[in-house]
Amino acid sequence: DTIIFNNNVIIGDQAFSAYVIFFAPNNLVCQNNIWLFTSNAMTQVDQNGGNPIIHNNSLTYHYGTPTITALNGTGNLDNQNPFFANIPANNPYWAADNDYNLGASSAGNDAGTDGNDVGIYNGYYDFDMRGYPTELPYLTEMTISNNMVPAGSNLNVNLKVNANKTN
C-alpha cells in the first residue's frame, strides 16, 4: 500500500516554519518533484509523521535567503535553482502562461528516477497547463437544438471538441 507522489511542482509561500502537504501518511514515496519556497520562514519539506516518508530524485529551492533542510532518500538535488524555461524572476507562482519546463542549465534535467527531467513534465503523462486531459478530446461547444421535449422523446445535442495533442 505505497502512496506515490510523482512529477509535481509544489510552491510554498506561507509564513510557517514547515510546509505540510501530507499528514502522517504511511509508505509515502515522493519522487521527481520540485519543491519551491518563497517565504523566509519556510525552510523544510515535511518528512515526519509518516511511516516512512521517502524523497527520491527531487529538487528543492528557496527564492529567498534560507537554506532548505536536505531531503532524505537518494538522488535529491537540495537547494538547486530549477532554472525554469520562462517564469517571472523570483516569482514561481502558478500562471497558465508560465513555462515550467526546465531550462538548459537546470540540475533537474535528466535527474528523475526514470532518467527524465524532474517536475511536471516528463512524467507518466504529458502535462498540459490548461488542465485538459492529454489523451482525450476536450469540449469546446455544446448546442441543444430542442431544449423542450416531451418525456420519452429524443433530446438533440451537438458537441464540438478539439484534440488536445496532435500527432
Regions found by a protein language model. Give the residues of each.
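Predominantly extracellular beta-rich ligand-binding scaffolds that present long acidic/polar faces
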Residues: 1-96
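Generic hydrophobic secondary-structure signal
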Residues: 5, 34, 84, 102, ...
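A broadly tuned, weak detector of single residues within folded domains
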Residues: 26, 51, 101, 152-153
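Generic short alpha-helical hydrophobic face used as a protein-protein interaction/packing hotspot
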Residues: 37, 62, 112-113, 163
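C-terminal accessory segments
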Residues: 73-132
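Short, compositionally biased P/S/T/A/G/V-rich stretches that sit at domain boundaries
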Residues: 116-155, 162-166
